[in-house]
Amino acid sequence: LTRTGNFTNNSATVTLNSDANEFATIKVGGSATGNITYNRWVNAIGTNEWDLIGSPVDGLSISSFASTNSSPLATGGGSGGNQYAIGYYDNSADDWTNYTTATIGDAGNFDIGKGYQMGTDSGATLAFTGTIATTDQTQAVQDHSGASGRIWNLVANPYPIYLNANTNADGSNNFLTVNGTTTMHDTYVAIYGYDADGSGYSIYNNTTAATYIAPGQAFMVAADNASSGTSVSMTEAMQTTTGGDDFISGDNMENTEVVVKLFNGDNELDSTKLFFDEVLTLGLDPGYDAGHFDDNAPIMTRLVEDDAGYGMAINAMGLDAMENAVIPLVINQSAGQEFRINLF
């Protein structure tokens, strides 16, 4: 749904629906008055299985959200004791905290642009009711890796509409270009989307086909080295009605890439990607190279030139590197453990 002018809802019910694969959208060209309800799909909770979600509407109380969604929202045994399956990430301590029956009343409103962990009993939609954000939004991010924390920050799409993620979605009005190295760490200019089955993070950057961020989808970004912090921006110019799943990629890129997978028996432990394009270098190409989310991942590579000690999940190089470069490979496995490497 696209509204070129102002949006006003005096008393009617305006509802947008989603399921595990598709998300309704609304785009407002002017101001917005009155509430909408976005029924946002959230996966079932399990061992290490959470969805990372942000509110696609503004002005929503966390306690009223928990009350409205008391049936599908996992609680008690599903999320532990007296906890709700709504939590936040504190990167200063690398810690996840769920709201409880004792703390939910003082939780305040959802901070749009901030991500939260959520889970439902068996996979269902949760109702978010509030106003539509019609201006550019920012979310503070900070690097706490110098102390007991981490570089990672959980942010989210604050709009009830998709956002362009990378240059293949839109050449300039996309999340990576707008934020880039001024906000994100040079080695991690990428979007790290959590796989809800608990297997880890998928990485989306400019080596990925056109990618779009679904309404209310949360993801990790790495702040730059400034401990004083900065902010990432989500802008109206990034908005698009194109999209599908939580993170949706278009057709395969017309470039050369190799995926190196590490196996123990038939069990795939992890993988790392080599990407080749004539405009890239053997050193760091921000937005194309991407460090691994886990510093001790089972398999990674290192930059061929100007290696600063980061394990790479995506190593992007020029086309001539396919024949001439020696690419350092890092494997973290216990002594005596059998493994094999396959190229795809």
Q: Where are the regions that the model predicts?
A:
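Boundary/junction segments of secreted and surface-exposed precursor proteins
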Residues: L16-S18, T25, N35-S55, M238, ...
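Conserved "landmark" site that anchors the functional core of diverse proteins
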Residues: W41-A44, S55-G87
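Amphipathic alpha-helical packing elements
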Residues: W41-D58, A147-L163
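Beta-strand-rich, repetitive solenoid scaffolds
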Residues: L16-S18, G54-S55, G87-Y89, G119, ...
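Generic marker of "main functional regions" within proteins
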Residues: S11-N17, A24-I26, L60-S63, S67, ...
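Compositionally biased Ser/Thr/Gly- and acidic/asparagine-rich
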Residues: S79, D90-D111, Q117-F344
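Intrinsic disorder/low-complexity signature
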Residues: V14-S18, I36, A66, S79, ...
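Extracellular beta-strand-rich, repetitive "passenger/adhesive" scaffolds
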Residues: L1-N48, T68-A74, D121-T125
